[in-house]
Amino acid sequence: MTKIHIYFIFILVGLNSAYAQNLYLKDVYTNEPISFGKIYPEFEKPFLSDIDGKFKLVNVNQNFSVKATSYIDTTITLTNGDSIIFLTPNLKSLENVTVKPGINPAEVIMAKVIANRKKNHPLENDGFISKQYSKYIFDVDQETRKNIFDTIMFPKPDSNIIRARNFLDKQYFFITESASRHFFEPPYKEKEIIDAFKVSGINDPLFSTFAQEMQSFHFYDNQVSVLGKQYVNPIAFGSLNRYLFVLEDSTFNQNDTTYTIYYRPRLNKNFDGLTGRLFINTNGYAIEKVVAEPFNKDTSGIDINIVQEYRFTNNTKWFPYKLSTTIDLKTAMITYGKEKNQSGFLQGKGSTYIESVSFNPKELEKERFNNVSIQTSDKANRISDTTWNRLRQNELNSKELKTYHVVDSFAKAENLDKYLFFAKVLATGKIPVSFFNIDLKRVFNYNAYEKYRFGLGIETSEKLMKPLLFGAYFGYGTGDKTIKYGGYSTLFLNRKTGTKLNLYIQSDVSEVGATKPFFSPGLFSNESLRYLFVSNMAMQEKYGATFSTTIRSNMGIQLDVNRHNLNFKNGYQYNGLSTFNALETSLIWSWNIREKVNLIGNQRVSMGTNYPRFQVQFDRGWIPTDYTEFLSYSRLNLSISQNVTVIGIGKLSWSFKGGMANGNVPLNYFFALQASRQNWSVSVPNSFETVGVNEFYHKKSASVFTRFTFNAIRTKAKWNQPQFGFHYAYGIGEFENKSEHNIEFKSMDKGLHEAGIFLNGLLTSGNSSIGLGSFYRFGYYSNEDWKKNIVPKIVVGFTF
């Protein structure tokens, strides 16, 4: 080797040590990265660190200062080998905002951001394929960690604190990773396939979508989803009137400028808003970085902070590059000492890295899209370590490896999969017992006809037979004093598409004039609440078969063929008869427009939709007569519903129900009105609150229900968040030849009107609320005594 080679090597080594060194900003107590700190070098222009606190100095032989939100300003002189800059939290830092008269420069900038929102939107204009890697770690919160590490320095520290310190030094509480491919084709075709996931202690795909559920993929929609809740975006149309914007800083880059803008909801503005900082780049006035958290803390004890970083990718557009989430689970308390104040809570920190972005690739033309937005591959939990090392951004450190090892061993010893299986079944309203499930919905129920209904339902679980299910139930009503029972068998042909065949036999009550929903109503659904008031029922012996499947992920059909016997118990007769036999076929078609579905293993989880939901049901039946002839009937029923969020104001819910029926048949084969009148009972949306359940029946009818609920008024009391709302319902219908039926009822030939006002949230607790409402019937079918048109009710609300 010549001297020139030796000199050249020395020069390279010297350059490597003096130039272009990667440095990191970290919290002195938690060792966590500090995002978007501003670096002020002595001989260079100021710039920002990235989402992981990483930055690079061209020349490290210089002093520099660092400023970061909520941290003490620090001046640094690097010594040999330094790569981590530790900053100390400024625990007394507050957001002091002074509003001055005149033109607000931040609003001028934000107006340009809002004007360019659609152009910069990642899911507009260009299709793409990208790869993503996510990692989430759960540890003790920052303040608790600081207290533990400070207390350990005392002369005689508590042994519990020593154990806590040793634990926190070696491992975390929980870790999860996932890797996925993201596909998008304009205008709205989108899907994400999770190819790999790994969760400490758990092998179930239920946790595979954890990263996707934490925050939105981008920050450009009118509503931003944070932990499943919707917040008004500060760059949404109209946000200049809703949000206060303050220009804090400007950072000059090579060809453009980055503005740092603080934002929060304006005073006396009542909406679910965010607060944080936007870093706006003058290249297209796009988001370069954003920090956001809910302005009003959640009463559930869960706080969350999100951070996103964008890059001008492939010289085409700004695109998400890194996503970060911090979630504080303040209800998950952790005690580390003997003193009362020696406790903390669980804190999760995670990052998602987006790479290999390709805009409008030819491969996109070969992809098949449906409404399954996220799908977990069948082998995603069986990925080799070699593949994982290739998918990860960085190798796992010793604490992360230790977490996997310890938690996996603990889970295996304690059989955590068994408890997870129990929790999944319990979420469906069933309790697993060995190879069977007990259906809680069959244990107790109430309606105005049966009064208190007690019973038991039991069915086989997947542990016994996966493709086949057998079940049976019985019940007894204290009102009608009659035993009901039934049995069924379900063959799951394809769980992913919801394709199944169900055979059933039952002897049970059935509401006269009811229509069948495509999906079984939930415990707190409007249909379940209305069922409390149903008092006109017939005893029905029925056997048949039902086939159901999904044509698309948001569209399904259900075909039912049955033979049933109706026995009216309340004195009702048609043509002198109270018992009827019928052969019936039913076809139900359901379509939820633009609904997104997550396919996790074999489980389909709806993510909801902001667009209308349609259901069409057609019934065709034949009733044999004494003369060996048949009386035929047909029923066509249409229902449409939608929930619309009016940004910054509230939510509008509306539904339409209409039907047509023909045939000379009993009342059961026509339509009962959706009604729920009873003073001081529970208010039932999408029903006539002032109408008795047996007051109206129709052969043809149409009803519209609307309800607008304003955003909650923020108060200082956690138990009180008042929400004003209005209700209006209208119906019209007809029923000729009422005299053929021996009971008295009306039809809405002249049009039925009612309106109401309510105040919910007088008392709130967690995800539930309670309030009061008053509803009034007016028009042709109102009572001459105006006081009898008023129906007071209790308004309840549940959010999950």
Give the ranges of each region predicted by the language model:
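Short, ordered, surface-exposed loop/turn motifs in non-cytosolic proteins
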Residues: 21, 28-43
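Short Pro-Gly-centered beta-turn/loop motif in secreted/extracellular proteins
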Residues: 34, 56-63
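Short, acidic Ser/Thr/Gly-rich low-complexity loop/linker segments typical of extracellular
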Residues: 44-54
